[in-house]
């Protein structure tokens, strides 16, 4: 969220940043709204000051035994008191219009971010690993999972509808192992503090990380004691009351982890703070109709290990590179080939100043697919959360800078392991990095199959 004072002082810079995102100029309109707010504040202050002055003059007139003047002043004060609620309402309305407009503005890209319209203009940063070579046509993950009898979309659809899955047996254990491996790596070697946060959060938390109001229709929400769809049956007042009591299912652990510092003032010596969590995540995928309708790539519910850092402005860019390397290390340990791309201005997320995507190679699809996004957000989220820190030796506070990244998406990591570690008979070799978590299971296969002497399909450096 941007400071209107900064926009007033830098309207051309602001509009130029929007242009790089492919957006229309907006500074003039925002300054009109700010002028209206400032005008409403001025009118309210004039009325309040006159009320206070007239109230004081009443006492003076009474002391001077000037009843006529006192009566006139009392009438004036009464009129001002009648007018003040309307002036206060006008000030609140003007402020609300400005706040709404500001809350819907995306973050501006850093100068180093490549210009572009969409994902086709993203730039490859670097690659890691060699793509596996198979002596057979590699299958997609859902073909492998269903053939093994361990990935069940039909039952999931009966339970919950489309875009859900039931994983069973050693496949469920493999998914659990992936999450545990990631958490152990990030906490044991990368210095992150593990957190087990709520997965139901209030509006303020979703606003703080900028999921609201822009992406309200992409989220799932619930209200104790009433189905959310019943909102259409109520009037405006009842609907607003329901909204006050609603809770949101988190689309990412970025929401609760980043909001751990909302409405707080930290000491500089505490920074950077680094948090990680493995949570279920929930997304409506409202804009994804017809995309990835089969398999686990795009689900309403999925597990993700999240990384969040809270830093000073001076630490933020170095922390961004560090977070990227932490996420990459997951795939390196799993020996999964991947590439890193720098997102262009037209493909960046709403709250991001700069984003790297890590895309893992999926042989079954014969393409790279996103498995992690790592973003630096500047003070964009901190302003929405009112999260500050006090520099050493300083009286005034500054907004912290926030960063977030997937470390990584557990479901997509499972997909990548299935496709990269498949064998010709359809069984799956368990990556060496996951062996400590699998209770002796080194190969996932149909219960009736016994292939103890099968070799891995490809050597992995």
Swiss-Prot record:
The UniProt record lists the keyword Cytoplasm: yes
Annotated catalysed reactions: tRNA(Ser) + L-serine + ATP = L-seryl-tRNA(Ser) + AMP + diphosphate + H(+); tRNA(Sec) + L-serine + ATP = L-seryl-tRNA(Sec) + AMP + diphosphate + H(+)
Pathway(s) this gene product operates in, as recorded in its UniProt entry: Aminoacyl-tRNA biosynthesis; selenocysteinyl-tRNA(Sec) biosynthesis; L-seryl-tRNA(Sec) from L-serine and tRNA(Sec): step 1/1
GO cellular component, one term: cytoplasm
Pfam family, one: Seryl_tRNA_N
Biased composition (Basic and acidic residues): 114-134
Role according to the record: Catalyzes the attachment of serine to tRNA(Ser). Is also able to aminoacylate tRNA(Sec) with serine, to form the misacylated tRNA L-seryl-tRNA(Sec), which will be further converted into selenocysteinyl-tRNA(Sec).
Protein name, per record: Serine--tRNA ligase
Organism: Methylocella silvestris (strain DSM 15510 / CIP 108128 / LMG 27833 / NCIMB 13906 / BL2)
């Amino acid at each position: 969220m941007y400071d209107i004072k900064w926009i007033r002082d830098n309207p051309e810079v602001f509009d130029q940043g929007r242009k790089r995102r492919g957006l229309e100029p907006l500074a003039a309109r925002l300054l009109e709204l700010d002028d209206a707010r400032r005008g409403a504040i001025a009118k309210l202050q004039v009325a309040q000051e006159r009320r206070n002055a007239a109230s004081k003059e009443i006492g003076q007139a009474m002391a001077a035994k000037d009843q006529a003047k006192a009566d006139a002043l009392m009438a004036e004060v009464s009129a001002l008191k009648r007018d003040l609620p309307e002036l206060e309402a006008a000030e609140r309305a003007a402020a609300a219009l400005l706040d709404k407009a500001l809350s819907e503005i995306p973050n501006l890209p850093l100068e180093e971010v490549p210009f572009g319209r969409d994902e086709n203009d993203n730039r490859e940063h670097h690659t890691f690993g060699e793509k596996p070579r198979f002596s057979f046509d590699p299958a997609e993950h859902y073909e492998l999972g269903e053939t093994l009898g361990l990935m069940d979309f039909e039952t999931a659809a009966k339970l919950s509808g489309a875009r859900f899955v039931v994983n069973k047996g050693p496949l469920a254990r493999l998914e659990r192992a992936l999450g545990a491996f990631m958490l152990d790596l990030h906490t044991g070697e990368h210095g992150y503090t593990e957190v087990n946060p709520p997965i139901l959060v209030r509006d303020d938390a979703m606003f703080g990380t900028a999921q609201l109001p822009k992406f309200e229709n992409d989220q799932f929400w619930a209200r104790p004691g009433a189905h959310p769809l019943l909102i259409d049956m109520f009037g405006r007042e009842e609907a607003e009351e329901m909204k006050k009591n609603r809770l949101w299912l988190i689309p990412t652990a970025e929401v609760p982890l980043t909001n751990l510092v909302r409405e707080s003032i930290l000491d500089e010596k505490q920074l950077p703070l680094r948090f990680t969590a493995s949570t279920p995540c929930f997304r409506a995928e409202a804009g994804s109709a017809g995309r990835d309708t089969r398999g686990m790539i795009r689900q309403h519910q999925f597990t993700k290990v999240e990384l969040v850092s809270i830093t000073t402005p001076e630490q933020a860019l170095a922390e961004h590179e560090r977070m990227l390397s932490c996420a990459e290390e997951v795939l390196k340990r799993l020996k999964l080939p991947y590439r890193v791309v720098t997102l262009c201005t037209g493909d960046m997320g709403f709250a991001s100043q700069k984003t790297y995507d890590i895309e893992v190679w999926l042989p079954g699809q014969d393409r790279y697919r996103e498995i992690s996004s790592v973003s630096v957000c500047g003070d964009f989220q901190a302003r929405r959360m009112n999260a500050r820190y006090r520099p050493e030796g300083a009286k005034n506070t500054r907004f912290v800078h926030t960063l977030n990244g997937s470390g990584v998406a557990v479901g997509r990591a499972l997909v990548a392991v299935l496709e990269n570690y498949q064998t010709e008979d359809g069984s799956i070799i368990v990556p060496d990095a996951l062996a400590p978590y699998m209770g002796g299971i080194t190969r996932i296969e149909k219960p009736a199959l016994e292939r103890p002497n099968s070799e891995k399909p490809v050597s992995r450096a």
